[in-house]
Design a protein with these regions (language model features):
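Catalytic phosphate/metal-binding cores of nucleic-acid and nucleotide-processing enzymes, i.e., regions
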Residues: 1-144
Length: 144
């Protein structure tokens, strides 16, 4: 049997809506982003779905994330579904960034191989839109 390709999915801002910002590795207060759980369940048919998050640096972060996923999956799918049972949970939590076929992340830029098209100032402008980005960037002069 051929192994499925790894699909690495970020947690905060992608699965967890993250509207309250960072509260700690074990505090996950916001609902899932609309459609996330159904999409992830469907993706398990084609991919080895692995969730990667900075929350996993805390030993209790994985448990909090699994609890969150199961709790919200019960609402989405009802009891008895594989997404609602800890021992059958079809998605893994990667303690380090996996060698993924593809990644889904709300804070990433798709690199096309041309560094000349990737302007650091443009990146700063985009990240300034983020609610937990620093207030100001002391960029006064761009090095050539």
């Amino acid at each position: 049997m051929r192994n499925k390709p790894i699909l690495c999915v970020d947690f905060d801002g992608v699965i967890h809506s993250y509207t309250s910002g960072w509260q700690g590795a074990t505090i996950i207060p916001d609902p899932p982003t609309p459609g996330a759980l159904k999409w992830l369940w469907k993706a398990t048919g084609w991919f080895d779905v692995q969730i990667y998050s900075s929350r996993l640096k805390d030993p209790l972060g994985r448990d909090a994330m699994l609890e969150y996923m199961i709790k919200h999956s019960r609402v989405e799918f009802g009891d008895g579904h594989p997404m609602t049972v800890s021992r059958d949970f079809p998605i893994t939590f990667a303690h380090e960034k996996p060698a993924a076929f593809l990644m889904i992340n709300d804070r990433a830029i798709c690199f096309d191989g041309d560094w000349s098209e990737l302007d650091p100032c443009d990146i700063l402008a985009v990240t300034k839109e983020s609610p937990d980005a620093p207030i100001s960037y002391p960029v006064t002069e761009i090095p050539e």
